[in-house]
UniProtKB/Swiss-Prot annotation:
This is Uncharacterized protein YhfG. It comes from Salmonella typhimurium (strain LT2 / SGSC1412 / ATCC 700720). The lineage of its organism: Bacteria, Pseudomonadati, Pseudomonadota, Gammaproteobacteria, Enterobacterales. Pfam families: YhfG. InterPro entries: YhfG.
Amino acid sequence: MKKLTDKQKSRFWEQRRNVNFQQSRRLEGIEIPLVTLTADEALVRLDELRRHYER
């Protein structure tokens, strides 16, 4: 099995952290839809929200 690159490791742990958070919230009875944005997609979304709310 090939070793993961640092970028792959980082992405893997981001995904695991997100899934673990979702499962932890579900145990508390709170349902939150899973967010699957890449870092670039998140930055674009933040820019859109800033433009909308900083009028």
